[in-house]
Amino acid sequence: MSRRRFDCRSVSGLLTTTPQTPIKTENFNNFYTLTPKELGRGKFAVVRQCISKSTGQEYAAKSLKKRRRGQDCRAEILHEIAVLELARSCPHVINLHEVYENATEIILVLEYAAGGEIFNLCLPELAEMVSENDVIRLIKQILEGVHYLHQNNIVHLDLKPQNILLSSIYPLGDIKIVDFGMSRKIGNASELREIMGTPEYLAPEILNYDPITTATDMWNIGIIAYMLLTHTSPFVGEDNQETYLNISQVNVDYSEEMFSSVSQLATDFIQSLLVKNPEKRPTAESCLSHSWLQQWDFGSLFHPEETSGSSQIQDLTLRSSEEKTSKSSCNGSCGAREDKENIPEDGSLVSKRFRFDDSLPSPHELVPDLFC
């Protein structure tokens, strides 16, 4: 089976409601000053810090190309705007401030999350800097945000540490879910089936081209928890074929060596999510009642002023954010994702257990025996 190519104009699962946020046609640069700080870049999108000329407030300007590979993808951008509007009252989803449009792109003016990606907290160098209590708080907030989306029949479909931001890193702030370019609306009569995403974060049902449900996001939350607690990526292989095989067979290392500093409750939480059958994964709502999340100790949170290595967490995350590039918001419907995924140029900050690829070949082409 070859990889399906989707026309942006016929993608299923898009919100078709007209955005309530006015799409301004005035020159963006008349109202905002773009700083040299680039927050992320992909093939079809770039995110840069900007400052309001009227208030001095910092924002993130996400510029999205309207045409991608010769296809008109404006409808997908409007879908992303509609999802952000739908989640406006959720504190754990990035806030949309304004929208501008010119001949070639649409610019989303978004809340600025100064703490960067929680991917930085997954780096081995920070293993001693982030406690399990910190992870509990972050996972709980992610679940609250995802539960809100699922209540509104929205699946994110690209949850990963690179798409979860922090309001601050020093001290550790609150999470903000970003990048809804792959998100879809579910619950209507037609089933949603697409092959899209980042290889090491794909759920088994996506590899099998089975219907997508809210359980797909729950698989990704299991991966995020695993990475925050072990500082390794659970399914990444030497190449895409090995990665897909690991996912299909749910080859996860739960060894004592890997989980030596992880509680049994945390292990149970991860194991409940990383199961092949989507119907056996708990919902976001039920996860919030898991025993692991109920034993959060407010008294032992990350306090940088009390941590001897606190400057290291700031230095490492600053280095990481400056050196790496991030993703675009284009999904499978606009062609393969060819964006770089947070790779420091010298590779110094990335564990050998993390690997990011420029494209997403068909799982069926790479591992045909798994998909009979």
From Swiss-Prot:
Entry keywords, A to Z: Apoptosis, ATP-binding, Cell membrane, Kinase, Membrane, Nucleotide-binding, Nucleus, Phosphoprotein, Serine/threonine-protein kinase, Transferase
Protein kinase domain: residues covered: 33-293
Entry coiled-coil feature ranges: none
Superkingdom of source: Eukaryota
EC class: transferase
InterPro entries: Kinase-like_dom_sf (IPR011009), Prot_kinase_dom (IPR000719), Protein_kinase_ATP_BS (IPR017441), Ser/Thr_kinase_AS (IPR008271), ST17B_STKc (IPR042763)
Catalytic activity: L-seryl-[protein] + ATP = O-phospho-L-seryl-[protein] + ADP + H(+); L-threonyl-[protein] + ATP = O-phospho-L-threonyl-[protein] + ADP + H(+)
Gene3D superfamilies assigned to the protein according to its UniProt record, in alphabetical order: Phosphorylase Kinase, domain 1, Transferase(Phosphotransferase) domain 1
Catalytic site: D158
Residues annotated for ATP binding in this entry: L39, G40, R41, G42, K43, F44, A45, V46, V47, K62
Entries under CDD domains matching the protein: STKc_DRAK2
Region entry Disordered, spans: 305-348
Listed EC numbers: 2.7.11.1
Gene Ontology terms: cellular component: actin cytoskeleton; endoplasmic reticulum-Golgi intermediate compartment; Flemming body; nucleoplasm; nucleus; plasma membrane
Main location group: nucleus
Location in the cell: Nucleus; Cell membrane; Endoplasmic reticulum-Golgi intermediate compartment
GO biological process: apoptotic process; intracellular signal transduction; positive regulation of fibroblast apoptotic process; protein autophosphorylation; protein phosphorylation
Post-translational modification: Autophosphorylated.
Comp. bias intervals (Polar residues): 307-319
A GO term, aspect molecular function: protein serine/threonine kinase activity
Family classification: Belongs to the protein kinase superfamily. CAMK Ser/Thr protein kinase family. DAP kinase subfamily.
Record function comment: Acts as a positive regulator of apoptosis. Phosphorylates myosin light chains.
UniProt name for this protein: Serine/threonine-protein kinase 17B
Biological source species: Mus musculus
Organismal lineage: Eukaryota, Metazoa, Chordata, Craniata, Vertebrata
